[in-house]
Amino acid sequence: MSKLGVFLTICLLLFPLTALQLDGDQPADKPAQRKLKILPKRKHWTRFTCCYEEECPPSCKLCC
């Protein structure tokens, strides 16, 4: 192996690319906050979908 290859291997072992931190303002760092902004507030929930303020079927559960 050439000297350059050995040098690059040592550098990658000492400073792996995964050790680099993301900026604090990137959305990947804050998935919970991003999720809260996407989901609207809902009052009633069914098993898989939500009921809104209109008439709820009996399968809805009150979540307040």
Curated annotation (Swiss-Prot):
GO terms for molecular function: ion channel inhibitor activity; toxin activity. It holds the Pfam family Conotoxin. Residues 1-19 form the signal peptide. It is found in: Secreted. It comes from the Eukaryota. Its main location: secreted. GO terms for cellular component: extracellular region. Expressed by the venom duct. Residues 20-49 form a propeptide. InterPro entries: Conotoxin. Keywords: Disulfide bond, Secreted, Signal, Toxin. Disulfide bonds join C50-C64, C51-C60, C56-C63. Belongs to the conotoxin M superfamily. The cysteine framework is III (CC-C-C-CC). This is Conotoxin reg3.16.
